[in-house]
């Protein structure tokens, strides 16, 4: 991999007895990397997350979209809401990035959707507890931050943006509950007229605009510690 070519490759990460499938995109001379944590019933093929990822790539940010569950696991509804498992799988993806010499030095952000947002917040909080600020920023799209532990919400230091559709009223309330507990730099952005999947005209474009702006602002650190996450 060189700094002057666009890299797109499929990857597999071995975690315990599972293999996680992922898609890596690295633009020339990236300003940072963003790891996507998909929500329940979604995957690396999510058209919404891929749309956001493409906008990030256009702005010089590398992306890794990865399935946190295998196909068999995803059929089990209870596993979809196993936040601890999702967090451990997300940690394995971070470890993979930190061991990849071509991208390990770039600032790292997390983009979470639905239950994936809870896993992203818990992982970011882990870094704080481990005295390691390796997560530079977090963005949640229609996320369930309320499913993260209270300790994680109160501990996280990474600047966090919560994006919710204005018509997704129950999720707005859940985001507000989590937002109150968070002590980091934070912002709750409600997109008027948007529902949970942001399928309305212009809604996903607004999500992308907000995410690009947030990550460009905080993915500024030129190097980060190459430290594996202990389980």
What feature does the model see in each segment?
Residues 11-103, 199-202, 206:
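Serine-hydrolase catalytic machinery in alpha/beta-hydrolase-like enzymes
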Residues 102-114:
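Alpha/beta-hydrolase fold nucleophile elbow
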Residues 112-122:
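Glycine-rich nucleophile elbow surrounding the catalytic serine of serine-hydrolase chemistry
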Residues 131-145:
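A conserved short beta-strand
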Residues 156, 162-164:
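Short beta-strand/loop motif that positions the catalytic acidic residue
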Residues 169-174:
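Conserved alpha/beta-hydrolase "acid-adjacent" motif
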Residues 182-197:
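Catalytic histidine neighborhood in serine/cysteine hydrolases
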Residues 202-231:
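Catalytic active-site module of serine/aspartate enzymes centered on a nucleophile-bearing elbow/loop
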């Amino acid at each position: 991999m060189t700094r002057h070519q666009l890299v797109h490759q499929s990857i597999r990460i071995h975690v315990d007895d599972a293999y996680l499938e992922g898609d890596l995109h690295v633009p020339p001379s990236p300003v940072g990397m963003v790891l996507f944590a998909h929500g329940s019933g979604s995957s690396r093929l999510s058209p919404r997350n891929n749309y956001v990822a493409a906008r990030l790539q256009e702005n010089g940010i590398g992306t890794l979209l990865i399935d946190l569950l295998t196909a068999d696991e995803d059929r089990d509804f209870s596993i979809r809401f196993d936040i601890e498992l999702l967090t451990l799988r997300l940690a394995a993806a971070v470890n993979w990035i930190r061991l990849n010499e071509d991208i390990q030095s770039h600032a790292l952000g997390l983009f979470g959707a639905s239950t994936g947002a809870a896993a992203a917040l818990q992982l970011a909080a882990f870094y704080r507890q481990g005295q390691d600020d390796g997560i530079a920023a977090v963005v949640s799209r229609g996320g369930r931050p309320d499913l993260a532990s209270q300790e994680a919400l109160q501990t996280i230091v990474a600047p966090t943006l919560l994006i919710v559709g204005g018509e997704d009223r129950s999720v707005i309330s859940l985001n507000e509950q989590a937002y109150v507990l968070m002590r980091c730099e934070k912002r709750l952005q409600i997109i008027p007229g948007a529902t949970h999947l942001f399928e309305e005209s212009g809604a996903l474009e607004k999500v992308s605009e907000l995410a690009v702006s947030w990550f460009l602002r905080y993915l500024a650190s030129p190097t980060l510690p190459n430290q594996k996450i202990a389980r």
